[in-house]
Structures are given as C-alpha cells and as structure tokens.
C-alpha cells in the first residue's frame, strides 16, 4: 500500500528491476576504482508542468551510487524532496538539466544553496544547455548578500568556487567518474533547443532519463538495451480537462501535444530501444482522478511488452 502522509513517505515502495550490463556500456572503459554498490534511482518529482500540485512535485530524480548523488532536473522543491527521500544534501556532486523550462530548472540554484546550508563543502558540477553558465552566475549574484553573510557570520566555506557549470550543445559523452559514465542525446522539445536526454551507465545497471520530448529516434539509440527508461508521458483524454483550468494559456494544448510523448508512444519508444523496464513520469495530466494508474499502464502496453511502472514521488526503482 502506498503511504501518502508526508512523514511516512520515507517508506518508499521499491521496484527492483534487472541488473544486467547493457549495450552501450563500452562507450568508455570502466574506471579501475569503480565500486560495487548498487545504483539506485529515486523519482523526486513526477508531475509535468510548472503549476504547483498537492501530491506530485515538479520533475526531478536522483541517482545514488557509493554515497554520491547525481540529480537530474531541479523542479520546484527538489531540495525538500531529497530530504524526504533520505538523501543527504551534502552528498550532491552532479546536476544534469535536460532543458530550460521552469518545471525542470526552477530550483537549480536553490538546491546548491540549500545543500551548502546543510553542510556541502565539496565541488558540484552542473551540466546542461546554454545559458547554464550565465544562469549560475546570476543566481549567485542574486543571493550574494546571503552567501557573504553566512560565510562571515557562520564560518562557511565560500560557495561560488564549489560550483562548476558546463554547457552542452550536442549529444555524446558528458562525464565519467569512479562510479558511472553519462552520455547525452539531443531530443525533440521545440521551441526549447537544445534539449537532452541522459543515459547513466554503472557496472550493475543502466538508467535513461528522456527529459521532455516528442518521440525521438536519437533517444531510442541512446536507450538501447537499458535496464530502466524514465520517459515523459501524456494521457491524451485528460488534456482537455487540464487546459480548461489554465485560462491564461490559450495555446497550451497545442504546445503539450506537439513536443511531448503519449503513454502509448512512450511504450513504442521503449520497445524499439529494447529496454527492460519503462517508467512513465512527467505525467500530464498529473493528479487527475479520472485517469487511473491502470489507464497509463494499458496505454504503454499497447506497444511495450515489458514491465511498466507509473511514476510516483519518492518511488525508488
């Protein structure tokens, strides 16, 4: 049974999916120092769009391996969700932004600032499309008074030198450390260009995060043989009810339909990529009582023959 009380959400449901090594893991040689702890994935926020909701936070997820946190997207409230998930904010080492929509980057700066307030003393590398470097500088400029005051008054290490922003303009290898390696692919999310999906390969398993995208051949190539594909998903019959409640966005339906993926097509992508498990996330509509979990699953299973999981906040996979 899923516990909905916030204090009880630490008892996350766990879905253990395949741990085989995958095609694509030979992109780079494995570091000799890589350890053997299992790579974990926790969905921090699974609702699509920037409007705050009661039960589903904005898009974010964290990959954990050997006490290191790799955060993918930073929607509103990501720091609090990390705390709910039992992740030490001081373990943050890498941030990957798929694209620059506010439901994916609104708390990019905040998660670093709050991690620093919670004891972060080590380097954090951020990866994503331009203008990530300018955004990073502007966030620190905005919060310069608070940062300087805390350094002087509380004896904290300087924050700005800890954060290193790296801008991506094309797909390919992103980074590799002693735990895993990361590869990006361009995905189709107009008018936001570039937008990326990311693949994380460790010794025991592989995880792909689609970001926001219409069905993408490049994403299918990126996800070949992956253990887990987390893909954004629409349930088309619920879109009209969603947009009816947002009267100041007159072309919202057209926007949603043109550069996201239906649950059925997410299944098609997963099948074409040969992934082991499909996770539907960035759900649109989120929290519509007329759209049941089984409806999402049935739509994805039109084309995908493997396990389908409907994402929920704080679900560990």
Q: Which residues make up each language-model segment?
A:
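N-terminal signal peptide c-region/cleavage motif recognized by signal peptidases
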Residues: 29-31
